[in-house]
Amino acid sequence: MTLVPMVVEQTSRGERAYDIYSRLLKERIIFITGPIEDQMASLIVAQLIFLESENPEKEICMYINSPGGVVTAGLSIYDTMQYIKPKVSTLCLGQAASMGSLLLAAGEPGMRYALPNSRIMIHQPSGGFQGQATDIEIHAKEILDIKGRLNDIYVKHTGRDLSEVVANMERDNFMRAEKAKDFGIIDKVIEKRLDIGVE
């Protein structure tokens, strides 16, 4: 059982209690923590759309600490990040692996960050199927199609050649924050909040 801290604020109407994530959402901060799956992705998408409706001009900050997860769930978050009007900055704390690294790279150019001890990992998608031979063949074609789409997304956001992306994603490829910057997944490694926007 996970305990979520509560924050109590004084208002003109008295005290108001929020769970910590709801309070941070008021500051336009969204957390992606843990495995990416459908229910979690729906909550993230809803938060992005809600914050756009609140103020379509104001930046949204996305903090990522995720081992990755379901590709289609992650792509629903990715597509929403690209779809909405506000700029979405991304920050890796802990790890951004697999689909987590794709979301990290998908932040607004110039606004993709990682803390110094973050770990970023990219790789090709994986899947396991059983059943009739024809069904296995269908699923194999689907996963190859998804692999191609993910490669294209990394090419778009890193500026790397397709051949470079394919070679780097052949197996689990772990990177320190500085290497992720060199690869183009992030724009800057930051140690303090004040470092954001400072060159």
UniProtKB/Swiss-Prot annotation:
Keywords, alphabetical = Cytoplasm, Hydrolase, Protease, Serine protease
List the catalysed reactions: Hydrolysis of proteins to small peptides in the presence of ATP and magnesium. alpha-casein is the usual test substrate. In the absence of ATP, only oligopeptides shorter than five residues are hydrolyzed (such as succinyl-Leu-Tyr-|-NHMec, and Leu-Tyr-Leu-|-Tyr-Trp, in which cleavage of the -Tyr-|-Leu- and -Tyr-|-Trp bonds also occurs)
What does the UniProt entry say about where the protein is found? Cytoplasm
What EC number(s) is this enzyme filed under?
A: 3.4.21.92
Q: Which Pfam families match?
A: CLP_protease
Main EC class of this protein?
A: hydrolase
One Gene Ontology MF term: serine-type endopeptidase activity
Hey, what's the signal peptide range on this chain? none
- Please name the InterPro entries in this protein's record: ClpP, ClpP/crotonase-like_dom_sf, ClpP/TepA, ClpP_His_AS, ClpP_Ser_AS
The active site consists of 98, 123
- Give the family this protein belongs to, as stated in its UniProt record: Belongs to the peptidase S14 family.
What is known about what this protein does?
Cleaves peptides in various proteins in a process that requires ATP hydrolysis. Has a chymotrypsin-like activity. Plays a major role in the degradation of misfolded proteins.
List, alphabetically, the PANTHER family matched.
ATP-DEPENDENT CLP PROTEASE PROTEOLYTIC SUBUNIT
Q: How is the quaternary structure described?
A: Fourteen ClpP subunits assemble into 2 heptameric rings which stack back to back to give a disk-like structure with a central cavity, resembling the structure of eukaryotic proteasomes.
Q: Which NCBIfam families match?
A: clpP, PRK00277.1, PRK12553.1
User: What is the protein name given in its UniProt record?
Assistant: ATP-dependent Clp protease proteolytic subunit
Per the UniProt record, the source organism is Ehrlichia chaffeensis (strain ATCC CRL-10679 / Arkansas)
Read off the lineage from the record: Bacteria, Pseudomonadati, Pseudomonadota, Alphaproteobacteria, Rickettsiales
Name of the gene: clpP
